[in-house]
Amino acid sequence: EYLAEGSVSGIALPPGIDSITLPAYRKRPDGNYTARALDMPLEQLVALRSQTILAALTAFAPQLLIVDNVPRGALSELDTVLPTMRARGTHIVLGLRDIIDTPEAVARQWERQKNADILRRCFDAVWIYGDPRVYDTISAYGLDRLESIEVTPVGYLDPNQRWEAKSDTGGTASDGTVAETSDAP
């Protein structure tokens, strides 16, 4: 089981897989956020999303949590979730695309959002979706200064490659399945 943020409607999910759709934000032209559909104050929506995420993760008890792009979540909604999951022993990884903005803009944003602090306190690793031969994200964004966190470029996703689950122990999924790419059609 896993928790997915985003739209998965219309996608056939395999047995044992489900999704939770969170109430959405809408970004206004001035850059501020509001509730997309619900008639509630933004602070209440942030709290609702945070509580929903925490409840789902508590129920699922994942070994691995991959946070996409924004270390503290949209509008800091993961601020209570991450320390709780960390205390439960969940391995927490930030998935980060290689080119976000200029290094200066990223440095300002990360400083304002206190991203380095939450990374040091709650994350085990950063996976960079990119190739350092194309763009050196680690140096450009100062990720090399996160001493206790493993920062790894994992390459680009190729939609033409298929993923298949293989067990690293030769057994079933419950005793150590890992995902590997395969060149098979």
Residue ranges and their predicted role:
Residues 75-85:
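Short Gly/Thr/Asp-enriched flexible loops that form oxyanion-binding sites at enzyme active sites
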Residues 16-17, 62, 89, 122-124, ...:
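Short, well-ordered alpha-helix to beta-strand connector turns
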Residues 66, 93-95, 127:
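Structural motif
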Residues 83-99:
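Active-site proximal beta-strand in glycosyltransferases
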Residues 2-44, 48-50, 55:
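Conserved nucleotide-sugar phosphate-binding/catalytic loop shared by glycosyltransferases and other
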Residues 97-185:
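A nucleotide-sugar donor-handling region in carbohydrate enzymes
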Residues 54-75:
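Short N-terminal targeting/anchoring amphipathic segment
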